[in-house]
């Protein structure tokens, strides 16, 4: 459900809750998954311009993997601008999500003899590795090139041991934002074939690459391997646009609407969604502007609370927790000479900074600017977290646990992945997958079972963040960067530390 320009609830959505098109790409992924299940490691590199749906394709792939009769381990990492200088950042986050919830016995079996290298790669599991006596008594000293080689072998060994229990789908999203170490590791994993049951799925945006971009050398190295395939996501066809509009607006589009969306979007799903939202919210206003103009004009209709949240997050460069967002807002307010402008008309929606931010987040989600994700729960003694590899070697628990088929029904990952239909809703980063307006933060902020630190907020698509960030005045940008850096300064994790340096560099080069 959404709301129109005067705040009344409507029955339209911001994004489609159905997965539309992309069958050729899903077919290729399914073949790759079958190859991995049969012990034939392979890789697939997919490219598409921004907004065509690469993130959603990966989310759909994860959904379908989660429903396979034969359990697959799905490992997913995203390279983000704010952590582009952190070595192995997307690999670190992906492996921490995989390893942190595991019981001790399973963790020890997967880590094996590579505890020291994996502890450097995934600092979050280092205390547990020390408790399990998986770290050497003395740190090993080696030259830089040997440290890199050992790191590569440690990751490959981990994937091999994981593959012995179940096939692995390793997905690295937005490689154009990745650091040199991540690019080197991806090349190594794609080209080394030792019978591991692993499929590597990598995505990037070619329109983001400069002529001298180092990723071009990585892509050349990948394409030279016989086990690496490539593919490109094309714009949606007209009939697929019809399905998209039907799913969003709840009915078949008029010829005028279809013509407008088809001509303006040129098959770009994100642009089509923004055009439809603009037509509903900007009544009497031309929707002939650019994507950025549509986004900023829609944002201008929102409350001061919502606009403050959007401005803060537009420069963050990654998803943030509610606690970090509150810290950012407090830092900015402390540095501002004037308090943030309150609502000019109507009843105040909230009292106090925390309530203002909560109201702003909810409104931003409701109008399709932000999406939210729930952090994967950490392992607790006596129970395996949902969707995590259990000691017996299967994916156990909700929401990703699978119920085996009846005996005699042969398991075929490729057939199952192809045969499933779209139309499901999932937690995806490039659309508002949750019920708009029903923020998990507001639903659960008083509940013991879901701390607010477990809820992450980010833009539905990075193009939305870029449009809003570009609309900020230079002096305002510097103040927001300073507030973001100060909020990250209290976090010990290397990725927030890199984000802090990123924001310091944007406004105080000497401190960075």
Regions of interest found by a model, annotated:
Residues 89, 120, 194-260, 264, ...:
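Alpha-helical sensor/transducer elements of the RecA-like P-loop NTPase core
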Residues 46:
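Hydrophobic anchor at the beta1->P-loop junction of P-loop NTPases
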Residues 2-8, 89-169, 220-223, 227, ...:
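Conserved Walker-type P-loop NTP-binding/catalytic site
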Residues 9-13, 52, 240-248, 252-512:
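Short secondary-structure boundary elements
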Residues 33-41, 163:
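Phosphate-binding P-loop
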Residues 1-31, 129-142, 286-292:
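Conserved adenine-nucleotide phosphate-binding loops and their immediately adjacent elements
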Residues 159-203, 257, 363:
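Conserved Walker B catalytic segment
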Residues 49-84, 89-92:
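P-loop NTPase Walker A phosphate-binding motif
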């Amino acid at each position: 459900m959404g709301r129109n320009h005067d705040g009344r609830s409507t029955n339209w959505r911001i994004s489609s809750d159905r997965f539309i098109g992309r069958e050729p790409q899903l077919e290729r992924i399914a073949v790759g998954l079958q190859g991995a299940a049969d012990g034939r490691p392979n890789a697939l590199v997919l490219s598409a311009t921004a907004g065509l749906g690469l993130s959603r394709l990966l989310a759909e792939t994860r959904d379908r993997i989660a429903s396979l009769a034969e359990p697959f381990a799905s490992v997913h990492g995203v390279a983000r601008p704010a952590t582009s200088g952190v070595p192995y950042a997307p690999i670190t986050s992906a492996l921490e999500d995989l390893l942190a919830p595991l019981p001790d016995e399973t963790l020890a079996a997967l880590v094996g003899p590579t505890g020291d290298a994996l502890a450097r790669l995934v600092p979050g599991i280092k205390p547990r590795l020390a408790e399990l006596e998986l770290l050497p008594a003395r740190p090993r000293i080696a030259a830089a090139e040997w440290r890199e080689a050992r790191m590569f072998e440690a990751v490959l060994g981990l994937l091999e041991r994981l593959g012995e229990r179940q096939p692995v789908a390793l997905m690295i999203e937005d490689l154009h934002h990745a650091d040199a170490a991540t690019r080197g590791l991806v090349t190594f994993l794609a080209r080394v074939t030792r019978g591991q049951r692993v499929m590597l799925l990598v995505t990037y945006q070619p329109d983001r690459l400069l002529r001298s971009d180092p990723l071009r050398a990585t892509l050349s190295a990948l394409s030279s391997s016989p086990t690496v395939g490539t593919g490109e996501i094309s714009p949606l066809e007209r009939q697929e646009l019809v399905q998209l509009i039907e799913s969003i607006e709840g009915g078949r589009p008029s010829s005028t609407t279809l013509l407008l969306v088809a001509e303006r979007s040129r098959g770009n799903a994100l642009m089509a969604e923004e055009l439809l939202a603009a037509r509903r919210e900007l009544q009497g206003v031309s929707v002939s502007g650019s994507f950025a103009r549509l986004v900023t004009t829609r944002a201008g209709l929102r409350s001061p609370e919502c606009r403050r949240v959007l401005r803060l997050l537009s420069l963050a460069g990654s998803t943030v927790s509610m606690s970090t967002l509150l810290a950012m807002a407090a830092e900015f307010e402390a540095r501002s000479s004037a308090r943030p402008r309150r609502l000019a008309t109507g009843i105040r929606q909230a009292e106090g900074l925390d309530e203002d931010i909560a109201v702003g987040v909810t409104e931003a989600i409701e109008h399709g600017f932000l999406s939210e994700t729930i952090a994967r729960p950490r392992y607790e003694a006596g129970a395996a977290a949902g969707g995590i590899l259990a000691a017996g070697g299967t994916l156990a628990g909700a929401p990703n646990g699978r119920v085996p088929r009846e005996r005699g029904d042969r398991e075929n990952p490729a057939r199952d992945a192809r045969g499933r239909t779209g139309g499901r809703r999932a937690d995806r980063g490039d659309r508002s997958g949750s019920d708009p307006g029903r923020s998990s933060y507001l639903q659960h902020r008083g509940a013991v079972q879901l701390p607010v630190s477990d809820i992450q907020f980010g833009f539905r698509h990075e193009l939305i963040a870029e449009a809003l960030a570009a609309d900020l005045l230079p002096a305002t940008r510097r103040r927001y960067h300073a507030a973001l850096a100060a909020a990250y300064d209290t976090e010990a994790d290397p990725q927030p530390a890199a984000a802090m340096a990123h924001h310091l560099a944007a406004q105080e080069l000497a401190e960075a």
